From Swiss-Prot:
Domain RNase NYN, residue spans: 135-290
Cofactor: binding comment: Mg(2+) is required for RNase activity.
Underlying gene: ZC3H12A
Region (Ubiquitin association domain): 42-87
Zinc fingers, C3H1-type class: 301-324
Name of this chain's protein: Endoribonuclease ZC3H12A
Co-factor(s): Mg(2+)
Organism name: Homo sapiens (Human)
Effect of N144A: No change in RNase activity
Similarity comment: family membership: Belongs to the ZC3H12 family.
Membrane topology (UniProt): Peripheral membrane protein
Stretches for region RNase: 112-297
Stretches for region Disordered: 1-40, 90-133, 343-420, 522-546
Length: 599
């Protein structure tokens, strides 16, 4: 069927048609022109190679593929070739099954598992043989066992049978019973013997052995059967089942003495039941299972499993075995914490990029330079502010010795809260610079925490505090809100400066029930007017001086509190009251801190 306008019909590929069928049908649409014969041969060779590679990926060998292609032809479609390969592979598998492989293949080993081991052609040993090979040989003193079962009056052969059966039930295969040969004679009233046929049955099974005995001049000559018993048990590294201690044999040879002490298994008969002790060598010796084994069982297999299982609440103090817990020794939490504390290395001082530790003088000078730079920024900002400017209720405050603060999200300098608290600062927690650098909001929260530590609960009136005195060009237009709350809201935008020195509180303030209640605002003053500088402590410095020296000490104290904890600054400035150089004081503070690490 030809297409419209004389075009050749285009063969559509069905979804089930393979790639090779589509290429074969496409190549059969027309004979190639003479100029394309070479290209067609190369294409057919490439197509054949692709077919071979495809079938080899499916697991068929090159020999099988070529034999099938010779049988069906090179132009055979993929499905036909694949069907023939399946039949050929099935026949090959039958041939392999009928003809045994002379060299068995090695087992596959997972990647990283090392070299594969040679196949073990020997059949695995049964579980009973493995169990019996781990058990010690048993040598039974037949005369002692029979007389014990007969209550020392009758030679009861049934007692020997009970003992032998007990060891057979436990998996022992090497059992030997020694009995004097004269016990095979007919019983007499003075020598009663019961169940004598058991001796012959055990002898047929090669379990019982008769020791030699004979009559000489009408008298019975009996060999010492105990020496047979101890000697065989010693040479076979087994155990001796008897209630006799063989004192005479212990004195003959020293190795026998030790062997009898360690390998003697005593027993009891309770109503035709053979019962050896569970602890043959005493309470602190091995158990009966380990006593009868060549290699003792591990502790996990010996211990009795805990009846509570996973619900056990005794922890590491439980004396029973928990298979779900790791076998390594466990320690308590306190012991682990102590071990970790001993293993953890001490913290070394931080180093700079060149690997050198910063000296105290360079560290203090750099920090003080940053503090002075922030103070200059605050002065510039305050000088640019005009008294008449008003930004929708927002107020900018200025003091000559203030420190510049950035809004939330910016970077600022640390701020010392010593001027707001007239009490001693030894009990205040140290506020890190990272916490105070996050902005005025975090400053308010830090100061709230500091005041909360001193004041206790909301219902407890704390000690009198020096209030924060705000300077506003608008006088009473500011609402009477909490000092820090109004301060935080008024400084929400732009850069502001917080004064470092404040005038003392008025002589009489009404007591506040809560620390957040505001103090009455002072009379309005000009923004550019510099307030009188007061030293900390309402006109009295902590070092007992007044005047210009106290003012200079207060300034140095304020700067150092922005770098070091206040209690360290007070301690060092108290020791060196005449020293006013910030760098030297910083070096002394670092030296004092190294000498008193606990403070």
């Amino acid at each position: 069927m030809s297409g419209p306008c004389g075009e050749k019909p285009v063969l559509e590929a069905s979804p089930t048609m393979s790639l090779w069928e589509f290429e074969d049908s496409h190549s059969r649409q027309g004979t190639p022109r003479p100029g394309q014969e070479l290209a067609a041969e190369e294409a057919s060779a490439l197509e054949l190679q692709m077919k071979v590679d495809f079938f080899r990926k499916l697991g068929y060998s090159s020999t099988e593929i070529h034999s099938v292609l010779q049988k069906l032809g090179v132009q055979a479609d993929t499905n036909t070739v694949l069907g023939e390969l399946v039949k050929h592979g099935t026949a090959t598998e039958r041939e392999r099954q009928t003809s045994p492989d002379p060299c068995p293949q090695l087992p596959l080993v997972p990647r990283g598992g090392g070299t594969p081991k040679a196949p073990n052609l020997e059949p695995p040993l049964p579980e009973e043989e493995k169990e019996g090979s781990d058990l010690r040989p048993v040598v039974i003193d037949g005369s002692n066992v029979a007389m014990s079962h007969g209550n020392k009056e009758v030679f009861s052969c049934r007692g020997i049978l009970l003992a032998v059966n007990w060891f057979l039930e436990r998996g022992h295969t090497d059992i030997t019973v020694f009995v004097p040969s004269w016990r095979k004679e007919q019983p007499r009233p003075d020598v009663p013997i019961t169940d004598q046929h058991i001796l012959r049955e055990l002898e047929k099974k090669k379990i019982l052995v008769f020791t030699p005995s004979r009559r000489v001049g009408g008298k019975r000559v009996v060999c010492y059967d105990d020496r047979f018993i101890v000697k065989l048990a010693y040479e076979s590294d087994g155990i001796v089942v008897s209630n006799d201690t063989y004192r005479d044999l212990q004195g003959e040879r020293q190795e026998w003495k030790r062997f009898i002490e360690e390998r003697l298994l005593m027993y009891s008969f309770v109503n035709d039941k053979f019962m050896p002790p569970d602890d043959p060598l005493g309470r602190h010796g091995p158990s009966l299972d380990n006593f009868l084994r060549k290699k003792p069982l591990t502790l996990e297999h010996r211990k009795q499993p805990c009846p509570y299982g996973r619900k056990c609440t005794y922890g590491i103090k439980c004396r029973f075995f928990h298979p779900e817990r790791p076998s390594c020794p466990q320690r308590s939490v306190a012991d682990e914490l102590r071990a970790n504390a001993l293993l953890s290395p001490p913290r070394a001082p931080s180093k700079d990029k060149n690997g050198r530790r910063p000296s105290p003088s360079s560290q203090s000078s750099s920090l003080l330079t940053e503090s002075e730079q922030c103070s200059l920024d605050g002065k510039k900002l305050g000088a640019q502010a005009s008294p008449g400017s008003r930004q929708e209720g927002l107020t900018q405050t200025y003091a000559p010795s203030g420190r510049s603060l950035a809004p939330s999200g910016g970077s600022g300098s640390s701020f010392g809260p010593t001027d707001w608290l007239p009490q001693t600062l030894d009990s205040l927690p140290y506020v890190s610079q990272d916490c105070l650098d996050s902005g005025i909001g975090s400053l308010e929260s830090q100061m709230s925490e500091l005041w909360g530590v001193r004041g206790g609960g909301p219902g407890e009136p704390g000690p009198p505090r020096a209030p924060y005195t705000g300077y506003s060009p608008y006088g009473s237009e500011l609402p009477a809100t909490a000092a820090f709350s109004a301060f935080g809201r008024a400084m929400g935008a732009g850069h502001f400066s917080v004064p470092a020195d404040y005038p003392p509180a008025p002589p009489a303030f009404p007591p506040r029930e809560y620390w957040s209640e505001p103090y009455p605002l002072p009379p309005p003053t000009s923004v550019l007017q510099e307030p009188p500088v007061q030293s900390p402590g309402a006109g009295r410095s902590p070092w007992g001086r007044a005047g210009s020296l106290a003012k200079e000490q207060a300034s140095v104290y304020t700067k150092l509190c922005g770098v070091f904890p206040p209690h360290l600054v007070e301690a060092v400035m108290g020791r060196f009251p005449q020293l006013l150089d910030p760098q030297q004081l910083a070096a002394e503070i670092l030296s004092y801190k190294s000498q008193h690490p606990s403070e």
